[in-house]
Amino acid sequence: MSKQKNDTFLRACRGEKTDYVPVWYMRQAGRSQPEYRALKEKYSLFEITHQPELCAYVTRLPVEQYHVDAAILYKDIMSPLPAIGVDVEIKAGVGPVIANPIRSLADVEKLGEIHPEEDVPYVLETIKLLTTEQLNVPLIGFAGAPFTLASYMIEGGPSKNYNKTKAFMYAEPKAWFALMDKLADMTIRYVKAQIRAGASAIQIFDSWVGAVNVDDYRTFIKPTMARIFAALREENVPLIMFGVGASHLAKEWNDLPLDVIGLDWRLSIREARERGITKALQGNLDPAVLLAPWEVIEKRVKQILDEGMEQPGYIFNLGHGIFPEIQPETLKRLTAFIHDYTSRK
């Protein structure tokens, strides 16, 4: 039986009133904690995620240290790709590198299917361990969105402009949509398995979708996202969408059958609502602010919280993931401040 007690995050996802604003941080598991850095001297990311006890420990750390209102599973958006035949390596200082980039419809057709219980049992075991024994807050499962995964698979690694990805999308639409379908099927199976193992909410990360304009999003990406969220909706857990530099797509996300839209710092909470966004909102402090003096942090955070609390259905987060230079003590202090400031309003 789950020991989960604090459901403030889940209630905010559903647009309900809460006693205070819940908070969690993207990339809170790992990154800046000294305990995590010590582990990374011994193990790679994939080695940690393949060991449920170790992975659960890393996932649990920020809940215990920062007192956040939700945990997010420690893993990478690339984690399910080897199961469908993608040779991926996370290289230090570079990021994911793909040995066999997609170049044609034939390459797409070679991709297999994921069977989560057989291909990623360690992910499901970690979730079960956390949700039945260790956490008193909800656990967020997650996956990468097809566009972002496809961009790595086509570019062969990180990119600054996604030229190869967009060229493939424009020049090879049949292959593009075949790839979207393969990745959508993988995402649906992978995420449903996480939910059935015990994840209480799901976030879909479309990290690089800001590279496309609205028309291209509607044509080449949105139908796939609609299919994914419609399938996940059957599991009856809150669904969150997040992308970087993608404020121009927020209205498109608002059409999808999801619960929460995560914003980066380029679009304010108030402006999002003025644009007609009706979903619950999550965000959106620029993580770079956390390197500034506390008085600067507090001023920026108050402004975001004041806007967020204008309506129910708000979760505080960063506008992107924590980076290693951010001090754990800053995050602990920030969480306490958010809880205190919003519980007095």
Curated annotation (Swiss-Prot):
Q: What is its main location?
A: cytoplasm
Biological process according to GO: protoporphyrinogen IX biosynthetic process
Q: Which biological pathway?
A: Porphyrin-containing compound metabolism; protoporphyrin-IX biosynthesis; coproporphyrinogen-III from 5-aminolevulinate: step 4/4
Q: Which InterPro entries match?
A: UROD/MetE-like_sf (IPR038071), Uroporphyrinogen_deCO2ase_HemE (IPR006361), Uroporphyrinogen_deCOase (IPR000257)
Reactions catalysed, as given in the entry: uroporphyrinogen III + 4 H(+) = coproporphyrinogen III + 4 CO2
Q: What is its EC number?
A: 4.1.1.37
Site positions for Transition state stabilizer: D76
Q: Per UniProt, where does substrate bind?
A: R27, Q28, A29, G30, R31, F46, D76, Y152, S207, H320
Record's keyword annotation contains Transmembrane helix? no
Highest rank taxon of the organism = Bacteria
- Give the transmembrane ranges: none
GO cellular component annotations of the record: cytosol
Q: Where in the cell is it found?
A: Cytoplasm
- Record's keyword terms, sorted: Cytoplasm, Decarboxylase, Lyase, Porphyrin biosynthesis
| GO molecular function ontology, one term from the record | uroporphyrinogen decarboxylase activity
Task: Kindly state the subunit structure of this protein.
Answer: Homodimer.
Task: Name the family.
Answer: Belongs to the uroporphyrinogen decarboxylase family.
Its biological purpose is as follows:
Catalyzes the decarboxylation of four acetate groups of uroporphyrinogen-III to yield coproporphyrinogen-III.
User: Which PANTHER family does the record associate with it?
Assistant: METHYLTETRAHYDROFOLATE:HOMOCYSTEINE METHYLTRANSFERASE RELATED, UROPORPHYRINOGEN DECARBOXYLASE
What's the protein name? Uroporphyrinogen decarboxylase
Q: Recite the lineage of the species.
A: Bacteria, Bacillati, Bacillota, Bacilli, Bacillales
Q: Which gene encodes it?
A: hemE
